A protein has these predicted regions:
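Internal anion-binding site segments
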Residues: 1-76
């Protein structure tokens, strides 16, 4: 099973993600960080979700850090 989202204008399936202990006041859907630790996204209730593994349309399943090497996503 996977969730589907859009990252940097690309449709992606999310296969692995974790809710972090951190909180945020950013609007849901805001990219908080994108790097070797994965992609951190603001969610409802001030929670933060880290995307760890994903698959872009037409691509192969990979770690988020590997995806970011070819598809940088701006924070904000």
């Amino acid at each position: 099973p996977a969730a589907v989202t859009e990252l940097g204008g690309n449709r992606c399936k999310v296969f692995s993600a974790s809710v972090l202990g951190a909180t945020t006041s950013a609007a849901p859907g805001t990219i908080l960080a994108a790097g070797k630790e994965g992609i951190q996204v603001a969610c409802g209730g001030g929670t933060v979700l880290r995307i760890d593994e994903l698959q872009a349309d037409g691509g192969k399943r990979m770690k988020a850090a590997d995806y970011l090497r070819g598809h940088p996503i701006p924070v904000g």
